[in-house]
Swiss-Prot record:
Name this protein carries in UniProt: Large ribosomal subunit protein uL16c
Gene Ontology annotations of biological process type: mitochondrial translation
Protein origin, superkingdom: Eukaryota
Species whose genome carries this gene: Drimys granadensis
PROSITE patterns according to UniProt: RIBOSOMAL_L16_1, RIBOSOMAL_L16_2
GO molecular function: rRNA binding; structural constituent of ribosome
Recorded family membership: Belongs to the universal ribosomal protein uL16 family.
Keyword check for Ribonucleoprotein: yes
């Protein structure tokens, strides 16, 4: 699972996902990509599940780039705990994704293989996405 090696602070505010993504919304490395159409928190487990699904489908052919990284800690309180006594402990990591953000890129394979692999990865995502081609 992806997570930062070290962070400046253990806990973060939740924040809010307003507007569209201005960073990371163009294809940089591959030829085909999966682009987010909705805002969401995508967990490191979901990112890994999508990456595995794509690599399994493409087998040895092609190369895959993961364009998002989970750098936001999500804290969870223990069950059956009363309110108060501080914030919960960090449980998992998420990536804040806004509409327009490229999630995965793929290159070195035919369009049919890339489309099928990216569709499988899209099913692992908690948001609506679209398949995009460079150029």
């Amino acid at each position: 699972m992806l997570s930062p090696k070290r962070t400046r602070f253990r806990k973060q505010h939740r924040g809010r996902m307003k507007g569209i993504s201005y960073r990371g919304n163009y294809i940089c490395f591959g030829r085909y990509a999966l682009q987010a159409l909705e805002p969401a928190w995508i967990t490191s487990r979901q990112i890994e599940a999508g990456r595995r699904a794509m690599t399994r489908y493409a087998r040895r052919g092609g190369k895959i780039w993961v364009r998002i990284f989970p750098d936001k800690p999500v804290t969870v309180r223990p069950t059956e705990t009363r309110m108060g006594s501080g914030k919960g402990s960090p449980e998992y990591w998420v990536s804040v994704v806004k509409p327009g953000r490229i999630l995965y890129e793929m290159g070195g394979v035919s369009e049919t293989v890339a489309r099928a692999a990216i569709e499988i990865a899209a099913c692992k995502m908690p948001i609506r996405t679209q398949f995009v081609i460079a150029g």
